[in-house]
Regions:
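Gly-rich Lys/Arg/Thr-decorated short loops/hinges at beta-loop-alpha junctions or inter-strand turns
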Residues: 150, 174-192, 207-212, 231-237, ...
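Active-site cofactor/cluster-binding pocket
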Residues: 1-210, 214, 505, 512
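Gly/Ser/Thr-rich loops at beta-strand to alpha-helix junctions
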Residues: 14-17, 133-135, 219-224, 248, ...
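Short beta-strand segments
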Residues: 73, 93-95, 109, 268, ...
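Generic secondary-structure signature for well-ordered alpha-helical cores
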Residues: 29-34, 77, 131-140, 144-155, ...
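Glycine-rich, anion-gripping cofactor-binding loops and their flanking helix/strand elements
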Residues: 48-85, 239, 243-252, 261, ...
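Thiamine diphosphate
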Residues: 2-66, 70-79, 83, 214, ...
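Flexible, low-complexity linker and terminal segments
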Residues: 196-203, 208, 340, 345-561
């Protein structure tokens, strides 16, 4: 096998697949291996088929691949579940009872070994030991990790897990010595000091770095992980974490928190965001900052609640009745998830507008090793003013951004969902109405001055331009780099609204324009056409609930060249 290995574990929900994933990825990282992992799972607590992909490489990897080099099957039917990804080079490991008929496999008696040690629960540790040996992990690293992880459960549990890992490790060593499996992956000692976090944690850390001190949400996949992350660290960072009774309450709590001087966010998915749109409009009218993480998943309605999609871009763009500014960010990497979330609080506070972070199931559930994230050495910049007796919350100013005060000063901070005058008092004066609409829309000029530019990757004399946004970034980039076209470039948007003015220049310079999106209607393509007047020659779309793989994008990009 090459120096890039794709290991997939497949079984039923509740069987411990995530336990194996957690053990193995952390052991690999601690031993100096670049590691990436993502998962696909059904919407059920028990049964069905769940799988996790662990990619180990000599270089840093961030993208999902279709191929399976080693498949560990923990349930009958697992191979058939993944049959489109299994080919002749796939090595299948498992017990005979768990391998579907017609497939060649190497029998590894995980359960039998675990039972001999004392309990079938140790079968997961046996599997970790086997895979660790195949990949080339130092057993001392594995042993140390198990000692630290199980120390709170007592010496007996620690000893039995080490014994289980050792038995599995010996099997893996035997397979390598017999030449049945060959892996040549180089270690990088610098990886040992890297972070190993998922997208939900990266967004949560970004919120903390951005000064978030209030989160109100109703749990909804795939955004729940952000709520739980901030709740777990609430005391440490002075965060009020509120699990609201519904999404309507959640968004209004957040708006109220901003009014009082906090930095607040809400997390939700498409169905929950549908309930929040009236609150979005309220934020637009009272010019309240607001940060929303919208975790996208296949819709309409409940759709596929545990799968991924980029289907809510236009919904987010046009959310909330009436015309008012908003900002849409779409992280494509864990680093982006951190920095863009941090930036979201800056944008929301400075421009007094809602900022929506468009994540999705693939992004929040994927993780890989990254270098340490840069946390600001100074407190996040805030834009609150001390009010005086003559304070006017909606003072008509040149750039449309009135000084924002909070209760506690000498002035009255009057906000209302009705149209209002400069002091915030309800009015039906039609001239004032026009001035207030124009005031709110003037913010676009200030926002456009700070738009995050798209990232251009490739030759300056490109002929084909591939465009992507959000979580498709890692797969598109790896595909473009390996498609074999020296005249192909990639333009990645991490801010999808407002559109950076350079977008038109990049699109005009290409002879052929291709857009790649995880939706059925090319929503970003529509938006770019609306903003630039330029359409795409080819649209590569996927909407079955799965992310693109590197291989399928290479194949699709080669079509019709």
């Amino acid at each position: 096998m090459k120096d890039d290995l794709s290991v997939v574990l497949c079984g039923e929900a509740g069987q411990g697949i995530q336990t194996v994933e957690r053990f193995l990825t952390r052991v690999l990282k601690f031993d100096g291996f670049n590691v990436y992992a993502t998962k696909e799972y059904m919407s059920r607590v028990r049964g069905g088929f769940n799988s996790t992909e662990i990619r180990v490489s000599s270089k840093n990897v961030k993208a999902f691949v279709n191929r399976i080099d080693i498949l560990v099957t923990l349930k009958k039917g697992a191979v058939n579940h993944l049959k489109d990804r299994v080919d002749d080079h796939t090595v299948i490991l498992g017990e005979a009872s768990n391998v579907d008929d017609g497939y060649k496999f190497i029998e590894v008696p995980f359960t039998k070994i675990a039972t001999e040690i004392g309990d079938r629960i140790f079968s997961n540790t046996v599997a970790v030991g086997t895979l660790s040996a195949i990949i080339g992990v130092d057993f001392k690293t594995l042993e140390k990790y198990l000692e630290e992880f199980f120390s709170r459960k007592g010496k007996d549990v620690v000893d039995k897990n080490i014994q289980a890992a050792k038995r599995g490790f010996e099997i893996g060593e035997g397979l390598v010595k017999e030449g049945k499996i060959k892996v040549e992956i180089k270690k990088d000692p610098n990886v040992k000091d890297d972070l190993l976090i998922d997208g939900a944690s990266a967004i949560g850390l970004g919120a903390i770095a951005g000064g978030c001190n209030f989160i109100s949400s109703y749990p909804m996949t795939p955004s729940t992980g952000i709520l739980t992350f901030l709740a777990e660290h609430a005391k440490e960072f002075g965060i009020v974490a509120e699990q609201a009774e519904d999404e309507i309450s959640a968004v209004n709590m957040a708006i109220g928190a901003w009014y009082a001087g906090s930095r607040a966010m809400v997390t939700t998915a498409g169905g929950g965001f549908a309930l929040m749109v009236e609150g979005m409009s309220l934020a637009g009218m009272i010019e309240s900052p607001l940060v929303v993480n919208l975790g996208q998943r296949p819709a309409p309605a409940t759709g596929l609640p545990t799968r991924t999609e980029q289907g809510d871009l236009l919904f987010a763009l046009y959310s909330g009745h009436g015309e008012f500014p908003k900002i849409l960010l779409a992280p494509g990497t864990l680093e982006d998830a951190f920095y863009l979330t941090q930036k979201a609080f800056y944008f929301a506070d400075k421009f007094q507008v809602p900022v929506i972070i468009l994540s999705d199931q693939y992004l929040v559930d994927s993780y890989y090793n990254i270098s340490n994230l840069e946390v600001p050495k100074v407190q996040p910049q805030k834009f609150i003013v001390e009010t005086t007796k003559d304070y006017k919350r909606y003072q008509l100013v040149e750039n449309g951004i009135s000084p924002r005060g909070i209760p506690g000063g000498e002035g009255l901070v009057d906000v209302d969902s009705d149209e209002h005058d400069e002091s915030g008092h309800i009015t039906e004066d039609l001239d004032i109405r026009v001035k207030m609409v124009e005031k709110r829309l003037k913010k676009f000029d200030a926002i456009r001055a700070e738009i995050i530019p798209p990232e251009f990757i490739g030759p300056k004399d490109y002929q084909t331009l591939v465009v992507g946004w959000g979580s498709t970034y890692p797969m598109i980039r790896e595909a473009v780099e390996n498609v074999g076209d020296k005249k192909m470039a990639f333009l990645y948007f991490k801010q999808v609204y407002p559109i950076h003015p350079d977008a038109k220049k990049y699109l005009q310079s290409a002879k052929k324009r291709i857009i790649i999106e995880n939706n059925a209607t090319s929503q970003f393509g529509q938006l770019l056409k609306l903003e630039t007047g330029i359409d795409f020659d080819k649209k590569i779309l996927k909407y079955n609930g799965m992310p693109f793989s590197v291989e399928e994008l290479i194949s699709r990009l080669k079509e019709g060249r």
